[in-house]
Amino acid sequence: SNASVEDMTYPRATYDECIAFIAKEYEEAAQMLDTERSSIETYKVPTAGAALALESRVLLEAASPWFNGNKYYVDFKRHTDGVHYFNQTYDATKWAKAAAVCKRIIDTGKYALYTVPADSKTPTFPANVSTANFPDGVGGIDPFRSYNDMFTGEESGFNVSEFMWAKEASWDLV
């Protein structure tokens, strides 16, 4: 294009404007993506639930004290109009927006927390930790291994209903 630099220069968006844009994009993606995988060959294709999960994380970050009314950013202003890049007023509704997206994911009934059954290696927990059966307590599961195995790859892929970040196995060790 032959447009001038001035015509191609736009003021930087605020953090809240960026979050709104990203959330809108994830909403649109969730509408276009399937709610379930049609076959094992499509394991690399994200589902609508994955898009909503990412949207919820973005909204949770925006609701956090780091970006929601944090006075640390008081001097971060757009030079064209003096608007703060980071909103200086705490907004509790940001938490509600994030929670609403999380609730939509829960209400699909398609997802569950990954757990590893308790066994002889499961540690004994302090008295202040409920031993009621999961999800009301730690009864019947090994919370440490349940969390740890999500990151170590210890769980066989055949037992996992959805991969959010997947990579084909490579046995080429050279």
Residue spans for each PLM region:
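Structured, solvent-exposed acidic/aromatic patches
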Residues: 1-174
